[in-house]
Amino acid sequence: MAKKVGVLLFIDLQPLPDSVEQWVKKTYHAELSGGATLQIVFNTQEACKLDVGTSVEAVVSLMHTPGRHSPSFLAEVARVLNPGGSFLVLEPLLVETQEQKYSSTQTNAGLERNLLLAGFVNSEVDFVTGVEIAKACTTSSVALNLVAVKSKKPSWDSASVFQLRKGSSQKGRARTNGNHQPVKFTAGDVMDDVLSMSKSVVKLDLTSNFKDDDEELIDEDDLLTEEDLKAPEIPKAESCAPTKKACKNCTCGRAELEEKEEETKLTAAQINNPTSSCGSCGLGDAFRCAGCPYRGMPTFKLGEKITLGESWLVADA
């Protein structure tokens, strides 16, 4: 019977340094317990394909060549890694401020993005310096920073099915904790979701018959002042109202109004032989002053009789 593979190690460095194998076995001793073995894959290419039945608890990928952790390679690792398994990537990477000299070279942000798209979560980036595993995988051909990225595969897998529990039939709402035990809501659980209510209660007495003799009633007449009780003064009518014209001793101002009306009336002489002291009366109302006697009359020529034009004598349709 074939032994179960606990940890899968990808590396493009041969021969394999003893320090690397010792470090992997020490770090992943829990995954290698119970008879599980360490499987090592050398010279990994970008289009790496593993056996269909491969299933491991942890994957370690140590590459001294930049750009080996392509999206297709990360997707293959995600396929063989069990849900909840850990994944460690070690690769020379450029910092974001450096110019990319090689098309296969990635940055920290680019590698994290590819890990996320492949389905890995909780990625943590660490710069590895002064460690034996880092010395074994460094290269002098390109000035890069050796970066270790730790991530995990979610505990759930794609197309996973979860059964929803029905609500508790007991009185009151219930919820479940991590041990799947029903927990009842308390008043403290909902204090943030409801408005605080005052403990004081306003009591209304609706038994009163409103016939208490001790109650004092206010007389509305007491609210009136002496000025309110005075009768209003009726305005006096004009002294010459019954007559058609103002009387001799007019004091109401009617005589002045009649004088102004007389001044504005045109005489026969003004119609037959119109004159103008300003010279603008015959041009129309737009050029006439406010007290002009010719206001409302059509345009005319000075010295000629004022007549209405034919358009004035035709009724509007």
Curated annotation (Swiss-Prot):
It holds the Pfam family Anamorsin_N. Residues 1-162 are annotated as: N-terminal SAM-like domain. It is found in: Cytoplasm; Mitochondrion intermembrane space. One of its GO terms (molecular function) is metal ion binding. The keyword Metal-binding applies. [4Fe-4S] cluster binds at C278, C281, C289, C292. [2Fe-2S] cluster binds at C240, C247, C250, C252. Residues 278-292 are annotated as: Fe-S binding site B. Keywords: 2Fe-2S, 4Fe-4S, Cytoplasm, Iron, Iron-sulfur, Metal-binding, Mitochondrion. Residues 240-252 are annotated as: Fe-S binding site A. A motif (Cx2C motif 2) lies at residues 289-292. Component of the cytosolic iron-sulfur (Fe-S) protein assembly (CIA) machinery. Required for the maturation of extramitochondrial Fe-S proteins. Part of an electron transfer chain functioning in an early step of cytosolic Fe-S biogenesis, facilitating the de novo assembly of a [4Fe-4S] cluster on the cytosolic Fe-S scaffold complex. Electrons are transferred from NADPH via a FAD- and FMN-containing diflavin oxidoreductase. The C-terminal domain binds 2 Fe-S clusters but is otherwise mostly in an intrinsically disordered conformation. The N-terminal domain has structural similarity with S-adenosyl-L-methionine-dependent methyltransferases, but does not bind S-adenosyl-L-methionine. It is required for correct assembly of the 2 Fe-S clusters. This is Anamorsin homolog 2. The lineage of its organism: Eukaryota, Viridiplantae, Streptophyta, Embryophyta, Bryophyta.
